[in-house]
Amino acid sequence: MKICKACSSCMVRTYVDGNIIFRCSCGESVQGDSQNLLVSSKVYHTGEMEDKYKIFIKNAPFDPTNCQIKKDCPNCHLDYLTQICIGSQKIIILVCRCGYTSNRG
């Protein structure tokens, strides 16, 4: 994970011509390196994983290691949301302490 130097938001990992590029919603981009490689694996018990994701999403706003972005919650108007990335498709989810969730991807 990379943090944008321009706006302090989390950058999203993308792949361009086999290269890792981190892009931010503000337009900034940074070249990745070998430290940013992702190892994937096959998930066999999808029902169990859905339950684990629910718990992960619910607890995400309270984990200080997760990325926080400056975006107001439409529910409680808190001035930041927690950004997490889940699943093999790397779906970006925005979560608030009040329980609000948004699938950005």
From Swiss-Prot:
Binding site for Zn(2+) 2: 73, 76, 96
Key words of the record: DNA-directed RNA polymerase, Early protein, Host cytoplasm, Metal-binding, Transcription, Viral transcription, Zinc, Zinc-finger
GO BP terms, alphabetized: viral transcription
Residues reported to bind Zn(2+) 1: 4, 7, 24, 26
Subcellular location: Host cytoplasm
Principal location class: host cell
Inducers of expression: Expressed in the early phase of the viral replicative cycle.
GO CC aspect terms: DNA-directed RNA polymerase complex; host cell cytoplasm
Chain positions of all zinc fingers (C4-type): 4-26
GO MF, one annotated term: zinc ion binding
UniProt feature coiled coil, ranges: none
Assembly behavior: Part of the viral DNA-directed RNA polymerase that consists of 8 polII-like subunits (RPB1, RPB2, RPB3, RPB5, RPB6, RPB7, RPB9, RPB10), a capping enzyme and a termination factor.
Biological role: Component of the DNA-directed RNA polymerase (RNAP) that catalyzes the transcription in the cytoplasm of viral DNA into RNA using the four ribonucleoside triphosphates as substrates.
Family from the record: Belongs to the Asfivirus DNA-directed RNA polymerase RPB9 homolog family.
Protein name (record): DNA-directed RNA polymerase RPB9 homolog
Organism: African swine fever virus (isolate Tick/Malawi/Lil 20-1/1983)
Lineage of origin: Viruses, Varidnaviria, Bamfordvirae, Nucleocytoviricota, Pokkesviricetes
